A protein has these predicted regions:
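Generic short beta-strand segments
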Residues: 7-10, 92-94
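A short, structural micro-pattern
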Residues: 3, 35-37, 104-106
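Conserved double-stranded beta-helix
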Residues: 64, 68-88, 92-93, 98-184
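Short, conserved phosphate-binding/catalytic loop or strand-edge motifs used
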Residues: 11-15
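Catalytic core of non-heme Fe(II) oxygenases with the double-stranded beta-helix
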Residues: 16-81, 119-129
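A short coil-to-beta-strand element that immediately follows conserved catalytic motifs
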Residues: 1-7
Length: 184
């Protein structure tokens, strides 16, 4: 079970410098290396090329015992991919937006992060999306935004699922309860 943690649109224009390497789970206080607490997806809306700032990735960095030191340089690769592609990485993987050395080629992408169902999300989805708008969304989106219980109890409001407060009956069934039902 996971939650939608955050979304970020990234637009890297000509002349922009490389972003500092970072991990998306850098605020997690559990020592590294650690189990995956987050998953990051990076969607390419335009072609990602070495020249226009394709995302830089340090392969295997999710296994390192430290966060990147911004004063140091690290070997990295450019995650080149055509528009319409998606890259999926462990949230502990060091990555950054690359430098755009092109004359007129903008690199546009979307980063969507997911976290463990018991974690606090980066963006507060309860306030980011109005309840009346959430009522119109598919039940799975309501689940991803946190309008459900984690393992049947976490996230309750007076013992009830938060889905009831947006009139979403379908969000009450969690993956945990489905697994438990098939095990019995």
């Amino acid at each position: 079970e996971c939650l939608l943690s955050g979304t970020t649109c990234m637009n890297i224009g000509p002349g922009e410098v490389m972003q500092g390497l970072h991990s998306d789970d850098g605020l997690v206080t559990v020592p590294r290396p650690r189990m995956p607490f987050m998953v990051t997806t990076i969607w390419a809306f335009t072609d990602f090329t070495d020249e226009n700032g394709a995302t830089r990735v340090v392969p295997g960095s999710h296994k390192f015992d430290h966060e990147p030191d911004y004063s140091k340089q690290y070997d990295h690769i450019a995650a080149e991919m055509p528009a319409g592609s998606v890259m999926i990485i462990n949230g502990g993987t060091w990555h950054s937006g690359g430098a755009n050395s092109s004359e007129d080629d903008w690199r546009l992408g979307l980063s969507v992060q997911y976290c463990q169902g018991w974690m606090r999300q980066q963006q507060n989805q309860y306030y980011a999306i109005k309840p009346e708008d959430m009522r119109e969304m598919p039940p799975r989106l309501a689940q991803l935004c946190g309008y459900t219980l984690y393992r049947g109890i976490m996230g309750h409001i007076d013992g009830a699922s938060p889905g009831g407060f947006i009139g979403a009956d379908a969000v009450d069934e969690t993956a945990y309860s489905r697994i438990r039902a098939t095990a019995d």
